[in-house]
Every structure is written in C-alpha cells, then in structure tokens.
A protein has these predicted regions:
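Alpha-helical cap/lid subdomain in secreted, periplasmic
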Residues: 1-161
Length: 162
C-alpha cells in the first residue's frame, strides 16, 4: 500500500491591502492555504498538526522521520519490498522522510531524524542485529534496535527547550 505524497498548499489569487513606501491600496496577490486532504501524506500531516495545535496549544510537538526499511514477508497478502523499490503509488521512502522534514519547517516544529541519527539501516547486512528477523522481517526493530531508538530519542529530546 502507498499513499501519494501530495502538496502542502493550494494557491489562489486574492485581493489584499498592502503598502511599502507608497500609499496603501488593494493588490492582487497569490495566497497559499494548507491542503487538508486525508488522501495524501502532506494533507494528513497538515490535518494532524492543525488538530494537535488546537487541542494542545501549549505543548511541544515533535516530528519523527521514518526509519530505513528493508524486505518484510508477513505472508501471502503482505510482502513489502525494501526501500530501493517504489511503493504502489510510485514513491520511494525518501520522499516521506523529506516530507516530515519539510513539515517541521512549515509548522515551526522540531524534527528528530530517525532515518539518519539512529544509525540503523537494515539495508546493510551487518546492521540486521537491530532488526527482528533477517529471514522475513527486516522492517521492525528488535529489542536491541528499540533500545537504540530509545537512546536516540532521549538524547535528541534533551537538546530541545522545554
């Protein structure tokens, strides 16, 4: 399964009052509005962050990027190729990682880049010590991998303001 990446904004042209070194007047300018489309990854992020900011206006929201991913075979109806392959809608995992980083910039949120700072990559055979089972599940971290993720998260969180 895959979800299209989508767009962050739609653009429209609108009239807006503006002045800079001249008399104020109405001008036509482009205006962007966040896309709230549950059928796209960026739309879902916009929806989720908007809702969290409404429900928890005084809380720090932190985004995490997805981990690297490798082959997983969970049966006849659930086989997931590694990250060298596009998903069913033609996207590589890198596009989803990049979208989370962009969301941090757009929404003013810190991003903890699990894709890089954990140092875990199941595409490298020697790193499979951090993943569940090299035979059929190179996607989910095992206990050792979860401990590494927890330490990464702890130290990254300590670097953020309260």
């Amino acid at each position: 399964a895959g979800i299209p990446i989508g767009e962050w904004f739609t653009e429209t042209e609108e009239q807006v009052l503006a002045a800079r070194g001249e008399m104020k007047k109405m001008e036509t300018r482009k205006k962007r509005t966040p896309v709230m489309d549950s059928n796209t990854y960026k739309g879902r992020i916009n929806i989720g962050i908007t809702r969290m900011k409404q429900l928890f206006p005084d809380k720090q929201i932190i985004l995490l990027t997805p981990l690297h991913r490798a082959f997983a075979n969970f049966g006849e109806t659930n086989v997931q190729p590694d990250e060298n392959y596009q998903n069913s809608c033609g996207e590589y995992v890198d596009a989803y990682v990049q979208a989370v980083k962009e969301a941090g910039n757009l929404w003013g949120l810190p991003v903890i880049d699990f894709n890089s700072v954990t140092g875990m990559n199941p595409m490298i055979e020697e790193q499979l010590i951090y993943f569940y089972d090299s035979g059929f599940d190179r996607l989910h971290p095992n206990t050792k991998g979860q401990e590494r993720m927890a330490r990464t998260l702890m130290y990254q969180l300590l670097a953020l303001p309260v």
